[in-house]
Amino acid sequence: DAKAVISVVGSYTDEYSKSNIANMTYGYVRWSEVYDMFIDKRVEVGNHSYDFHSNNHGRNGSKRNSGESEDTYRNIFVDDTQKAQDRFMTKTGFAPIIYTYPFGAYSEETTDMLKSMGFKMSLTCNEGINHITDADSLFMLKRYNRPSGISTADFFAKMGID
């Protein structure tokens, strides 16, 4: 049995929960489906931000902007992350303990902020092997992010798996 991690962007889930219309080029889940995932023993739901998964706000994911003060960044990051956590609680009764960085973009302050908010793990887009030794090594985990348009065989070959 393998367990999947599904990382949810709160603003997208709010948008797609308003109707039964699905976007065929960029499918997304509704809050009722997120609830089903939380209660499924094979799925771990992660927080993928509330609204950092776009470049519309002049920010690269959840990364601190150049010239932005640490206090301003902290407020923006914590507000967005907490907004998502609050939506998870309101809509499903659960809150994630995993944070997945939008676009894999992060700053050196983010791990401490996530820990202070009760998160137990974070996922980057850095590729590589993780060596889990203690609770702290569950932050900034590497992963192989499979983009669209690549076959399963090519994806695994890239990792050296035949």
Placement of each model-derived feature along the sequence:
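C-terminal domain-boundary segment and adjacent tail
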Residues: M89-T92, T111, K115-G149, A157-D162
